Amino acid sequence: VPANCLLPMKVGFCRAHVPRFYYNSSSGKCEGFTYGGCGANANNFQTKAQCEKACR
């Protein structure tokens, strides 16, 4: 698993409600979360498919 996929899920500090996906290293799966719109890290994907492709 690439290092960016091991970063913790980060909602960010803005107040938008953007559906995104992150790789959950505990479950070994890509899971959905609501992103605030800014202050992301590299474990933040627009689709589940993008997450799964990047983090297998």
UniProtKB/Swiss-Prot annotation:
GO terms for cellular component: extracellular space; nematocyst. SUPFAM superfamilies: BPTI-like (SSF57362). Expressed by acrorhagi. Residues 5-55 form the BPTI/Kunitz inhibitor domain. It is found in: Secreted; Nematocyst. The record marks R15, A16 as: Reactive bond for trypsin. Pfam families: Kunitz_BPTI. Gene3D superfamilies: Pancreatic trypsin inhibitor Kunitz domain. Disulfide bonds join C5-C55, C14-C38, C30-C51. Keywords: Disulfide bond, Nematocyst, Protease inhibitor, Secreted, Serine protease inhibitor. Coiled coil: none annotated. InterPro entries: Kunitz_BPTI, Kunitz_BPTI_sf, Prtase_inh_Kunz-CS, TFPI/VKTCI-like. Its main location: secreted. One of its GO terms (molecular function) is serine-type endopeptidase inhibitor activity. It comes from the Eukaryota. Does not inhibit potassium channels (Kv), as well as metalloproteases, and cysteine proteases (papain and bromelain). Serine protease inhibitor that is strongly active against trypsin (950 IU/mg) and moderately active against plasmin. Belongs to the venom Kunitz-type family. Sea anemone type 2 potassium channel toxin subfamily. This is PI-actitoxin-Afv2a. It comes from Anthopleura fuscoviridis (Sea anemone).
